Amino acid sequence: MTDSVRSKNRQEERSGLSTRRLLQATAQLVAEVGYDRTTLAEIGKRAGYSHGLVSRRFGSKSALVETLIQKLSERFGHERLPETLSHTTGIDALLAVLIEIRKDSANSPESLRGFYALLFEGLKPIPELHTFVADLHAGYLDSLTRQVAAGSRTGRLRRGVDPAEVTELTVNAVRGLAYRWLLDEDRVDFDRGLDSLARQLVQLAAPPEDGTR
C-alpha cells in the first residue's frame, strides 16, 4: 500500500468518525432541548469540532437532521423493510415488523426513542424537514402495504380484510404508542403495547386457522 493510499484511508476514517460524532451530538441535543433550540455551534461543541466543520459537512441544520433521520431509518426498519419482509406477506409481514421493533426496543431503547423523537420533529413548521419526514412515512407505508397485499393472493390475510387499511391501522397504532412512550415512559410499557397490538392483529387479519394462536 502506497503512502498516498494510506493517507487517503486515514482521511476517510477521520471523516467517517467526525460524521458519526456530529450525528450523535445532534441526536442528543434534539432529544434534550428540541430541534428549535439546537444550533450548529452547539452540535459542533458537543461533538468536539468547530462550527465551521458542521456547516461545511452538512450545510444546514435541517440537512444534518435529515441525514440523521435517514441513518436511523436504515437502522430501525424503514430502509431495512425489504430485507425484513423478503419472505413474509399478509399478516406475517405485519407481525414481522412488530417483532423487529420489539428487538430494537430491547437492544437499543434510547436510540429507538431518539428515532421516534426526530420523526415527530417533522411536525414543526420547517418545510424541508416536514416534507422529508412525510415522504419517509409515505414510502414506508407503501412498501409495507405491498407486502401485506401479497398475502391476499397467498392466503396469508383473512378474506375481506383490506391490505391498505390494516397496514395503515398498524403503522398508526405503532406511531401513537411511540408518542405515548416518549411522553410518559414510566407509565407506558412500549413492549407490552406492541405485544397487545400483535394479538389484536391476529384476531383481525389472520386466516381463520390462525385466529386462535
Residue ranges and their predicted role:
Residues 47-58:
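Short hydrophobic/aromatic patch on the recognition helix
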Residues 32-36, 87, 108, 154:
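Short coil/turn segments at alpha/beta junctions that flank glycine-rich nucleotide-binding fingerprints
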Residues 16-24, 36-37, 57-81, 95, ...:
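An amphipathic alpha-helix adjacent to DNA-recognition modules
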Residues 130-134, 152-200, 208-213:
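Hydrophobic/aromatic-rich alpha-helical bundle segments in the mid-to-C-terminal region
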Residues 77, 107-110, 127-154, 165-168:
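Amphipathic alpha-helical packing segments from all-alpha helical-bundle domains
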Residues 1-33, 40-46, 63-66:
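Basic, helix-initiating cap at the start of DNA-binding domains
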Residues 67, 81-112, 163-170, 194, ...:
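Hydrophobic alpha-helical connector segments
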